[in-house]
Amino acid sequence: MSVARERLALIVSEFTDLDSREKLELLLDFSNNLAVLPPEHALLASRSEHRVHECQTPVYLQIELDANQKVHLFADIAPEAPTVKGFVAILAGAFDGCSCDEVLGMQSNLLEQMGLADVLGILRSRGLRAIQEYIKREIVRAIEKQTLTKERAMRENA
């Protein structure tokens, strides 16, 4: 089992036997786990290309790949959206330092696995699923950018 899957399985197990109210409380607890943006990402929310437009809550995400193709997720989410912030904190914690393939291979039914789809309602669930898909799209975009940069460097050095 991949690292991301193991991390998510552990989180899903925390939600398993909870009632609706307890699930929401746990999700709110996770919102406290979202890392504070490092200074180099402080202006994330001012850049519209990082906004997840499908989400009603202003959510700004930046995906970076390190030299080993490991994923790092940076997020800026309004404090008045703790459920969204909690979900992003779960994804960030599960995906940080994982390979691109691990994250891209993740199923999009995490809300159902956690039993949150019915608790959160259709609109919020749709927005949270959009966040998952945004992360995958941005990883593909980052891979393409790294590939182009490497190809350009090889041509310049040839």
Question: Model-flagged regions — what are they?
Answer:
Residues K23, T57, T83-F87, S99, ...:
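Amphipathic alpha-helical interface surfaces
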Residues A42-I63:
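Structured beta-strand/loop patches that form or line metal/cofactor-binding pockets in enzymes
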